[in-house]
Swiss-Prot record:
This is Non-structural protein 1. InterPro entries: NS1 (IPR004208), NS1A (IPR000256), NS1A_effect_dom-like_sf (IPR038064), uS15_NS1_RNA-bd_sf (IPR009068). It is found in: Host nucleus; Host cytoplasm. Its main location: host cell. GO terms for cellular component: host cell cytoplasm; host cell nucleus. Residues 1-73 are annotated as: RNA-binding and homodimerization. Residues 180-215 are annotated as: CPSF4-binding. A motif (Nuclear export signal) lies at residues 137-146. Keywords: Eukaryotic host gene expression shutoff by virus, Host cytoplasm, Host gene expression shutoff by virus, Host mRNA suppression by virus, Host nucleus, Host-virus interaction, Inhibition of host innate immune response by virus, Inhibition of host interferon signaling pathway by virus, Inhibition of host PKR by virus, Inhibition of host pre-mRNA processing by virus, Inhibition of host RIG-I by virus, Inhibition of host RLR pathway by virus, Interferon antiviral system evasion, RNA-binding, Ubl conjugation, Viral immunoevasion. The keyword Lipid metabolism does not apply. Belongs to the influenza A viruses NS1 family. One of its GO terms (molecular function) is RNA binding.
Length: 230
């Protein structure tokens, strides 16, 4: 196993522990708590994949961070902070919408890269809107936290989420996953729209009513990708 993979996991575990202590003092805002919950799932998946205990990794990560801080000068820290581009966290969904459990009558699931696409193929003839929470850097989607498909009644009928065991994805990965979800939903004569935030940063190809146009051939291709169950 690559040593950098192990040490990266150890540092991530310790930093998550620090953030959790911060949240326990009721100091975190909604985006902070949302990322904390998502990162916890990611760490569990990575720990399982690597065969590493999170508690042991957290203690090792603490030693690594302490060693770095001992060697870090205030001036070097200022220069590092100044060179890192600031990311923005954008939210279409409330914390309740993100954390709500949902169920599928005809569940379909597929994996697209490091993203998992889930949808209920029992849904027909509905008006559906896609909402997402994600971070943006340089006006481009950086990290998708969660995307969900809602009916006009507020029911959740689809979802795109990062796989905890496969961290890392590009804005193009997200766009392809959105296309797959849309194609699967439209196959059952649903009308799908994308939120303004998603149009701007993740989809970038929609008509005037916010409904991304997909040619019939592409729709059929996208729908077929949804058909494969995991």
């Amino acid at each position: 196993m690559d040593s950098n993979t192990v040490s990266s996991f150890q540092v991530d575990c310790f930093l998550w522990h620090v953030r959790k202590r911060f949240a326990d003092q009721e100091l975190g805002d909604a985006p902070f708590l949302d990322r904390l919950r998502r990162d916890q799932k990611s760490l569990r998946g990575r720990g399982s994949t690597l065969g590493l205990d999170i508690g042991t990794a957290t203690r090792a990560g603490k030693q690594i961070v302490e060693r770095i801080l001992e060697e870090e000068s205030d001036e070097a820290l200022k220069m590092t902070i100044a060179s890192v581009p600031a990311s923005r966290y954008l939210t279409d969904m409330t914390l309740e919408e993100m954390s709500r459990d949902w169920f599928m009558l005809m569940p379909k699931q597929t994996v697209a890269g490091s993203l998992c696409i889930r949808m209920d193929q029992a849904i027909m003839d509905k008006n559906i809107i896609l909402k997402a929470n994600f971070s943006v850097t340089f006006d481009r989607l950086e990290t998708l936290i969660l995307l969900r498909a809602f009916t006009e009644e507020g029911a959740i009928v689809g979802e795109i989420s990062p796989l905890p065991s496969l961290p890392g994805h590009t804005d193009e990965d997200v766009k392809n996953a959105i296309g797959g979800l849309i194609g699967g939903l439209e196959w059952n004569d649903n009308t799908v729209r994308v939120s303004e935030t998603l149009q701007r940063f993740a989809w970038r190809s929609s008509n005037e009513d916010g409904r991304p146009p997909l040619p019939p051939k592409q729709k059929r291709k996208m729908a077929r990708t949804i058909e494969s169950e995991v």
